[in-house]
Amino acid sequence: MGREFWNAVEENPIIAAVKSMDDLEQCCKLEDIRVVFILFGDIVKKIKAAGKIAMVHVDLIGGLSPREIAVEYLKNNTDADGIITTKPSLIKKAKELSLYTVLRYFLLDSMAYENILTQQHTVRPDFIEVLPGAMPKVIQKLCSEIKVPVIAGGLIIDKESVMGALTA
């Protein structure tokens, strides 16, 4: 597995989260966007044709249950570069299949925070995504305690939210 995903995030840390066809059309026109989180439908080919890295949220794919077999299906039947999931077992499977991985956490309380600190060592995702992303102080603290790069997602509603998350 190469470093294309890592390099793309490093070059432009703003990641498009595509939830509709309108989002998809707009995203594919933006040259600065290099990584796309796919949160709906069967659009990997269009994302790849636009020269972007396609990360599929395996938990949200209609018709597939979020199990290891779904990760195998994505690897064998699509051009997806990687997966996003809340399930550590799917991250492990994706790593075995040389897919990029983003482990998504809903950071609701201190127990969820402690889970991140514990699981990052056993699961070893490429990135950890924390939601909501509009928590720069918590994200900054987390970044100082773990080695896995952190992506801030959810509730990023304006430029101030983007800048707060990026500086964290």
What is each residue range found by the language model?
Residues M1-I53, H57, G62-L64, D79-A80:
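Conserved N-terminal beta1-alpha1 strand-loop-helix module at the mouth
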Residues E31-D32, A50, T78-D79, L97-S98, ...:
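Short, structured coil segments at secondary-structure junctions
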Residues W6-V9, V56, N76, S98, ...:
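Generic, low-specificity signal for short hydrophobic/alpha-helical stretches with a mild N-terminal bias
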Residues R3, F40-G51, G63-E68, T85-L99, ...:
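Active-site-adjacent beta->alpha loops and helix N-cap segments on the catalytic face
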Residues P13-V18, R34-V36, A54-V58, I83-I84, ...:
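Hydrophobic faces of well-ordered beta-strands that scaffold small-molecule active sites
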Residues I43-M55, L60-N77, V123-D126, S161-A168:
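Ligand-binding grooves and catalytic loops that recognize ribose/phosphate and carbohydrate rings
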Residues L24-K29, I69-L74, I116-T122, K137-A152, ...:
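Catalytic cores of alpha/beta
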